[in-house]
Amino acid sequence: MNVKEKYELAKKEYEKWGIDVDKVLDELNKVKISIHCWQGDDVKGFEVVQNELSGGIQCNGNYPGAARNAEELRKDLDKALSLIPGKHKVNLHAIYLETNGEFVDRDEIKPEHFANWVKWAKENGLGLDFNPTIFSHPKSADGLTLSHPDKEIRDFWIRHSIASRKIGEYFGKELGQTCLTNIWIPDGYKDIPSDRLGPRRRLKESLDEIFKVQIDKKYNLDCVESKVFGIGAEAYTVGSNEFYLNYAAKNNIMSLMDTGHYHPTEVVSDKLSAMLLFDEKVALHVSRPVRWDSDHVVVYDDELKEIAKEIVRNDALDRVIIGLDFFDASINRIAAWTIGSRNMIKALLNAMLTPNDKLRELQEEGNFTERLALMEEFKTYPMGDIWNYYCEKNNVPVGESWIKEVKEYEKDVLSKRN
């Protein structure tokens, strides 16, 4: 049997539960994943003066072929996107600017420094998201930025953040797709602080200054991202979960939840329904924390599937902005993008092929036996045949056949880079 014939057979299994598989694939095709550019060069960026990676972030490995400039990074993204079904967005950090060899400090970045990214996105029908890069810089060397006691340093990062929001607005206007601009800072202390309130007050005041500048939400949406701890900030993080949840709620901006930014016993899948009750939209950075915020490549595991189910069963595909955030320099970077992105989409498909209404009904009835039994039986339903057809329909490789393309690209392109 060919892919289409297997699909038609598998469809019948789901139709028994009232699931319209053709409609599911049409809906899935509307979902845009925000694919992070920084997997392609190990979070180095293209500033004229290169700074060492900091902010408690680590990218381990020395697999050959990392992109050395924006042109190479776009070429690598082109290859990865040709292996991922659907039309998506690309997420940029401020350090991925292009300045023709001129030094431009972070607080001086302008839309023109990202014109090539916009041109490329237009040509490929992509949207762009953005992030100020508030780490890996001399003015973040002591681990404090927007909460720094030194007003000059705070003001520098305030200017950078405002400039970043204006770039987000530029992306939205040029591409006709709303840009999400996300603020994350590494601020915190290695050991027990003697003042927890002061840095948080300064952070609040800095954010107030940043968001005082009015930008049309049609073009740019703002969000803030918390973290439980980082390397070098084990004892105290200024931008904690409680801080940002309150700040976002009070100021009518979005919260972004990174799956690696919580205590290891906490899961984002359990947080989504609470957020969706109170927030119009929620943003995600889907990662894979191994014992800490290690940013491993996203795999098709239980938590990823549960996150997708929470989005789908709560009818929130248009309310949850899904971004990826991982970086692994120990494996082929095109493969890393492909694996993580395909897994995220696969998890959404799995959620959409789940009899959510029936399972909800069983829970309301208190029929926990049948609920568990049905959940378990659906784990071996023929979703793989649906997935393969979805890939074929989107003109991307079916099954593991994409690996061959990555190997050829490595041989022809990546291996020739120093």
Swiss-Prot record:
This protein's pathway: Carbohydrate degradation; L-rhamnose degradation; glycerone phosphate from L-rhamnose: step 1/3
UniProt keyword Mitochondrion, yes or no: no
Reactions accelerated catalytically: L-rhamnopyranose = L-rhamnulose
GO MF annotations in UniProt: L-rhamnose isomerase activity; manganese ion binding
Enzyme Commission number(s) of this protein: 5.3.1.14
GO terms under cellular component: cytoplasm
Entry's Gene Ontology BP terms: L-lyxose metabolic process; rhamnose catabolic process
SUPFAM superfamilies hit by this protein: Xylose isomerase-like (SSF51658)
InterPro entries named among the record's database cross-references: L-rhamnose_isomerase, Rhamnose_isomerase, Xyl_isomerase-like_sf
Cofactor note (record): Binds 1 Mn(2+) ion per subunit.
Superkingdom classification of source: Bacteria
Family: Belongs to the rhamnose isomerase family.
Identification of the protein by name: L-rhamnose isomerase
Organism: Clostridium beijerinckii (strain ATCC 51743 / NCIMB 8052) (Clostridium acetobutylicum)
